[in-house]
């Protein structure tokens, strides 16, 4: 079956990553050829298996274009396209709270470009916040090997300012001040719920 992205490019299943032999003391848990998405998926699997949280990646909707019917009782999809995702990457429940978040990365070393986000994602997070959900973004500076968890409210400040003539990126220095830096470990690979604990506790104390 041929699956295509919205731009028509053919989707190809990524092959297995080759393991590299190294001493445990020199392992950088963020440098194993994994995508940020896979690292978060692995972390979510750990949280689920240990009854800590239930968080899943939302499936990307697919539009079926061509179907063959070699048998009356079976249909074979020959061609399909990934549709544009309408919301964010992940959602779930933790400590009785609804979570909704996006994961993005950049090769830029000094700022995070706001063009990595889409208007429909910002709108969706605003709607979730209005219903007392907890929304945030996990940002990775790939060239620096650094990870941050930034609340949606802080993201909105920069998103709204760009429409008023403000800069179209968030400086790394601002992210260092506003966001919680996440550090790789063995399990979970990205312990982002540790940072969320502080956000939930602060929110609970206000109410």
Curated annotation (Swiss-Prot):
Record bears the keyword DNA damage: yes
Molecular function, one GO term: magnesium ion binding
Keyword annotations from UniProtKB, A to Z: Cytoplasm, DNA damage, DNA recombination, DNA repair, Endonuclease, Hydrolase, Magnesium, Metal-binding, Nuclease
SUPFAM superfamilies named in the record: Restriction endonuclease-like (SSF52980)
Residues annotated to bind Mg(2+): 87, 89, 102, 121
A UniProt-annotated Pfam family: RecU
BP-aspect Gene Ontology terms: chromosome segregation; DNA recombination; DNA repair
Coiled-coil portions: none
Function of the molecule: Endonuclease that resolves Holliday junction intermediates in genetic recombination. Cleaves mobile four-strand junctions by introducing symmetrical nicks in paired strands. Promotes annealing of linear ssDNA with homologous dsDNA. Required for DNA repair, homologous recombination and chromosome segregation.
Protein's UniProt name: Holliday junction resolvase RecU
Gene: recU
């Amino acid at each position: 079956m041929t699956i295509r992205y919205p731009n028509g490019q053919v989707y190809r299943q990524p092959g297995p990553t080759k393991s590299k032999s190294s001493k445990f003391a020199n392992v950088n848990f963020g440098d194993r050829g994994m995508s940020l998405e896979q690292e978060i998926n692995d972390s979510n699997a750990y949280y689920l298996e240990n009854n800590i949280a239930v968080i899943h990646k939302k499936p990307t909707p697919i539009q079926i274009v061509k179907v063959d019917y070699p048998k009356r009782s079976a249909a074979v999809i020959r061609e399909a396209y990934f549709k544009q995702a309408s919301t964010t990457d992940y959602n779930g429940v933790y400590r009785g709270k609804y979570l909704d978040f996006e994961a993005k990365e950049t090769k830029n070393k000094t700022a995070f470009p706001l063009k990595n986000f889409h208007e429909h994602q910002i709108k969706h997070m605003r709607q979730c916040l209005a219903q007392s959900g907890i929304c945030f973004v996990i940002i990775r500076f790939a060239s620096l090997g650094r990870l941050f968890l930034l609340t949606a409210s802080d993201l909105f400040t920069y998103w709204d300012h760009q429409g008023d003539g403000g800069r179209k990126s968030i400086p790394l220095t601002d992210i260092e001040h506003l966001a919680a830096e996440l550090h790789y470990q063995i399990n979970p690979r990205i312990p982002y719920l540790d940072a969320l604990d502080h956000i939930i506790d602060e929110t609970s104390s206000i109410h």
